[in-house]
Amino acid sequence: MGTPCHYALFDLQPSFRLDLDKLATRYRELAREVHPDRFADASEREQRIALEKSAALNDAYQTLRSAPRRARYLLAISGHEVPQEVTVHDPDFLLQQMQWREELEELQDEADLDGVGVFKKRLKFAQDTLNEDFAACWDAPGERDKAERLMRRMQFLDKLAQEVRQLEERLDD
């Protein structure tokens, strides 16, 4: 038995643009149906199947709710498998990465919580813009190479956003 498509689990068509609130609602509905606790009195086989379904559902949800993971998944199911670690060959974006990292280091060194908040808003805007660019690119035939480049940028910004959240938590303590 193969793993069903993440979109199929949620009765969705593969698309980058998703209503994340509806996705979360559907996830909660499905999670209740397959939760292993509901199968406590079932056979060992049924318990194992419930556990597998629950794990597959959780994985699908985590993938679809994350823009970079969703982009990577769409590329993969369309036959454009992308290796996890590939060097980005975009000088402008590499320069932007270095500038963001330097700015984040300065904010950390200065323990500037307000500055981190401003940085976080700019980063969110950059992520939203990149998500829109990917969505438009995804909807255009013949743009898979560009979509892959955009997905890599999305992954970087997502990682940077995680680092910003961690810094914010450290400075807020």
From Swiss-Prot:
Gene Ontology MF terms in the entry: ATPase activator activity; protein-folding chaperone binding
GO terms under biological process: [2Fe-2S] cluster assembly; protein complex oligomerization; protein folding
SUPFAM superfamilies: Chaperone J-domain, HSC20 (HSCB), C-terminal oligomerisation domain
Membrane spanning stretches: none
Described function: Co-chaperone involved in the maturation of iron-sulfur cluster-containing proteins. Seems to help targeting proteins to be folded toward HscA.
Family under the similarity heading: Belongs to the HscB family.
Subunit structure: Interacts with HscA and stimulates its ATPase activity.
Protein name: Co-chaperone protein HscB homolog
Encoding gene (name): hscB
